[in-house]
């Protein structure tokens, strides 16, 4: 068993862990609720550093705005960072906020919904905390796109920079959190207000 520290993300490499089934990995996560675990496509386990209270507040703000929009529109379902999704490449990822269309949700069985469902959200958001390296987050966003995400926001509140990811084009970089990010056409009518994410 070996450990690799990549931009403050700890990767646990072990042949035994790489052989875990989807069900066994889910059970591992349930047995360790105080640790946020993800799984790479090669089945190596990723330990995510815990976020501080301010980072958690900002992630909660994003999730809250998305939840309020979805409550009004009722076009799908909203998830926060404790939810994991088993992507087509076999990785299991947990965005800070995610939205799944109603059509995609209805294709899942009840048993799948209770675990890490084999589905890729249409929209994801990652919020960078001071302990997060930017490079692994950008790689994570590329993984989302490669697996079917239609729109992704990578938010860096410390530098007031947002990166918008869409399939087939380079990420768009936006500076300044005195604005809203438009999620059309994936999320009709949703605009993420960045001002509550500013420092202080």
Predicted regions, residues:
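Gly/Pro/Ser/Thr-rich low-complexity, intrinsically disordered segments predominantly at protein N-termini
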Residues: 1-200
């Amino acid at each position: 068993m070996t450990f690799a520290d990549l931009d403050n993300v700890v990767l646990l490499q072990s042949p035994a862990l790489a052989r875990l089934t989807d069900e066994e990995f889910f059970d591992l996560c349930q047995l360790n609720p105080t640790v946020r675990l993800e799984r790479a496509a090669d089945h190596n386990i990723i330990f995510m550093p815990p976020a501080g209270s301010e980072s958690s507040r900002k992630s909660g703000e994003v999730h809250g705005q998305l939840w309020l929009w979805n409550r009004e529109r009722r076009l799908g379902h909203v998830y926060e960072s404790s939810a994991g999704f088993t992507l087509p490449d076999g990785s299991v990822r947990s965005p800070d906020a995610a939205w799944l269309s109603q059509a995609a949700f209805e294709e899942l069985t009840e048993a799948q919904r209770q675990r890490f469902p084999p589905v890729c959200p249409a929209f994801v958001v990652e919020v960078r905390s001071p302990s997060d390296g930017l490079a692994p987050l950008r790689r994570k966003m590329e993984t989302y796109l490669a697996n079917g995400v239609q729109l992704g926001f990578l938010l860096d509140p410390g530098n007031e920079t947002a990166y918008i990811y869409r399939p087939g084009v380079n990420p768009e970089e936006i500076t300044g959190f005195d604005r809203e990010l438009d999620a059309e056409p994936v999320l009709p009518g949703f605009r993420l207000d960045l001002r509550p994410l500013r420092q202080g």
